[in-house]
Structures are given as C-alpha cells and as structure tokens.
Amino acid sequence: MSNMKAEQQYIDLFAQCEDLVCRHSTPVMNALRAEALANFERLGFPSTRSEDYKYTDVAQAFAPDYGLNINRVAIPVNPYDVFRCDVPNLSTSLYFVVNDTFYDKDLPKAHLPEGVYAGGLKAFTEQYPEIASKYYGKAAPSSKDGIIALNTMLAQDGFVVYVPKNVVVERPIQLVNIFRNDVDTMANRRVLVIMEPHSEAKLLVCDHSIDDVKFLATQVVEIFAEEGARFDYYDLEESSVSTTRFSSVHVRQAASANVLVNGITLTNGLTRNNYYVELNGEYAESTLCGMSVLDKEQQMDTYSHITHAVPNCTSNELFKNVLNDHAVGVFSGRILVKEDAQKTAAYQTNRNLCATREARMYSKPQLEIYADDVKCSHGMTTGQLDENALFYMQSRGIPRDEARMLLSVAFTSDVIDHVRLEALKDRLHKLVEKRFRGELAKCAGCRICK
C-alpha cells in the first residue's frame, strides 16, 4: 500500500488480489464481495464531517501501510500450548482466532451438546451453506457504512456459534482473538451467532495484542436471537496502545428473545464500538452495557442505535468511562421508538469521570419517539471525583491515591454487575481494580501475557 487516498489503496489491493481472497474463502462469503466493493467505492470511510464520527478520523487510522494475510499463511504457534485464561471456577469451551484466521488444529474436546456448532466461519459456510447464506451479512449489510463494506470485501474467516432449537449450552464458549506478527498487521474478523428458538448460550470474546508492532482490526458481529432465545455476549478488550479496532455489533431479536451485550475495555489504543439492536418481536428484552478505563492518549468512541419496532419490548442501556491523562471518550446513543411500538420501556444512561483537566469526554444521548404510550428516559453526566468523598476517606486514614482508586472502582462496578456469570464477574472486578492501581498491563491469567 502507498500513501494515496486511504480508500483507494484498499480498492486497488482488492483488484490485485481478488482471486486470492476468494480462493482462500468460500462461495457464501465470496457472493457478497462485489456488492461490498461497490458500496465501499460509494461510501468510502466515514468522515469527521458526519455527526456520528465527528471525533474519530477513520481515514487517518486506515491510511498507514498494514500487511494482510490474504494467502492465509499459518502462524507458527499453537495458542493452546502458550495461552491459558485462568478465571477461577469458570470452565469454557475455548477457541482461538490468530489475527483473522480461525485456529483449527489440535482442537480440544468442546463439551458442546449435540447439534451445537462453535468454530470457524469458513468451515461452517462449507458444511452448512444454506444456513450460512440465510444469516451471513443480513444484520450487517455492506450498504450500512464503509467500514462494514471493507470488512465484507476482505474477510476470509471468522467464528460461528450455532445453537439449535431448545438446546441449552451450559458451559460458556470463549473466543480469544490474538494479534501476533513481526510487521504492522490488519485483520478483518467476523463473528456470526445463530440462536434458534428457545436456545441458550453465552460467548466471551477476549482481544489481545502480543507483539509491539501496530495492529488494525475491523470486526463485524452479527447476532440473531430467534423466539425465546437467550444469549450473552461479553467483549473484553485488553490489547495495546498500538492497536486500533473498529467493531460493529448487530443484534436482531425476535419475540421474547433476551440478549445481553457487555463490552469492557481495559487496554487499547483507539477503539470505535458500534452497537445496533433491533427489537422485532414483542416482549423482547435487550441489555446493552459498556465501560472503559482510559489513560495516556487512548480513545474510546461508542455509538449505539436501538430500534423498538414492535410493542411491549424493553431496552436498558448503560455506558461508563473513566478518563485520565489526555484520554478522549465519545458516546453517541440513539433510541428509536417506532409508531407501532406502544408499551415500550427504554432507558439510556451515560456516566463519565474525567480524572484530569486534560481528559475530554463528548456525549450525545438521543431519543426519537413516535409512539405515545411509552416509558423512556435518557441521561448523561460528566464530572470529576467527589472531593468531599475523597476528603472524608482521607480523614479516615485512607491515602488519597487509594481513595481515588476505590471511588473509581465503585463508579464502574454496576456495569460489571450486569455480567450473568459469577466467576467472570468476580474476575472482572479484580481486573478493573488492578487497572486502576496501574498493576495491569495485560490479563495476568494468560501465560502468553506474563
């Protein structure tokens, strides 16, 4: 790639390597590439002139020269040999994506019920092309924005969770995304979750960057929860200050489906998280949470859009950020209640702490309501730690730095309290405390991070 216009270098790359991209993928994924290319040429990267991307220069993030593993060259490491996610009292079915390739060698026994699929997207589309075609790219069409179009154009693999009707997966499924390379690297990841009626599962995704080079990730997550399904999606980002991530999570819920999405960022460089939730069946319930702890010049940009399309649905949204040094936080959240969506209950809250004068937080909560029989609210506050509380704690013999840490931990605790896995909840509380103490560079439970 060269220093030409950011979009053009990817268009030229695809023109040169389209055959290789398709050869190392499958017909289901390849069928969407031409349309994705056309949409990317039309849309380009979102501009800071757009209100939704006002504080994040996307084109600048994509402009540098990143390497892509289009030939799917194997990474000479077995992550099962070097990686251990040590959460006490939590047993998971563990899988890995290295850069953007599902690691399909030496897979351990999955402990999954009959009919459940957890594994590579490429393999899933080959084994179950009809199911894959029904869902892949449907919640996140490439016409939605230029980053999704780019991802759809270039993605060759990813991860799938498929749970048949009436099946309950008791053991959580864990996916670890590992960035590892000797050169600056770009990865285009996909996650597809298909929950058939009255099924249940939980997915924990952990992002790690191992090496000191620059990494750039685009990630598109599509979650389909059919009638009565129950699904939890936990996204823990512990990458590095040289990692940039653009993630879009798209959730479609049918009647009585219950979906929890909780994103926690403890270490990053620049992160943009988009969340799109569609409540398309009555009595569907959505819980959308997130928090970040930022310092140095880290940036977290969160955008959410929840659509209430039918009556009697509930959504609860809570995002919090703690910013130190010159960190930047952005939150833009919109709840759309359509005319037919009577008896809607929708609540949105954004709370932020700026621990230094140099830290910046931009927040824009929004309600767009076309129904008249609803219960909706939104609220935003940005401030600093309570000096009276700090003074009181110091008067009781608690050092000021310790008092600041304890108040910061308490501020973020309600986001973690939404986690519906007790062992994971306990570990996250401890990780957040370590982060505030400055003791956490990466998850201490991982051999590869020690």
Language-model regions: role of each:
Residues 114-117, 121, 127, 131-398, ...:
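Conserved beta-strand/loop scaffold segments within soluble protein domains that form the structured core
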